[in-house]
Amino acid sequence: MSIGSFVRFDRRYGLVIFALGIWIWIGYSIYAHTSKKIIKATIIQSSKPVRHIDDRIYPQKKETLWFDTLYFPKGNELRHPKYGYLGYRQNFVAFFDTDIDVPKDEFVNFVIYSDDGFRLTIDKQKIMEYPKDRPFQKSEKVVRLAKGKHHIHIKYFQGYGQLGIVGYYAVGMSAKEAQKARKYLIGKSSSDLKFLEH
């Protein structure tokens, strides 16, 4: 084998390794940014102002997306850290739906930070709400859930200005224990509560 053929072989080998590296990187990027179907989000843009959780919506655009967590931090546009900016800034509602499996009867503390308002229901029963405009603030409620499967539905609205909604939960054998327990993002399973993938 001459030096020239060795150099050609080396370049080809290098190109194959480079192409393989790019292929692996693209595959990982797609996998890392593919949403687990944990939380179904239906977002409706209204052509008229929204100032209250029960205001009539005049649909201008409707979109259904899937997310792994209820984490849309405070900002000027609806954004998820994993999936980026979603193009919603004002006058919209979002419906978040997910199912959970509770392994035993337990108390669950739900903590919702929102700007503007929201309503949380479990199995069609209203648990807590803040129905009007507000800056990014916290609402908290402890509920007792029986062993088994439950459906969580969160309605969120944004009027104008800053926006965001972030949800956490914590589990305990008593209400007081649930308030002090470690908090997890809604959508992230723990040993005490499992979010079901669709």
Task: Describe the residue ranges of each PLM region.
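Extracellular/secretory pathway-exposed regions associated with glycan biology
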Residues: 3-103, 113-198
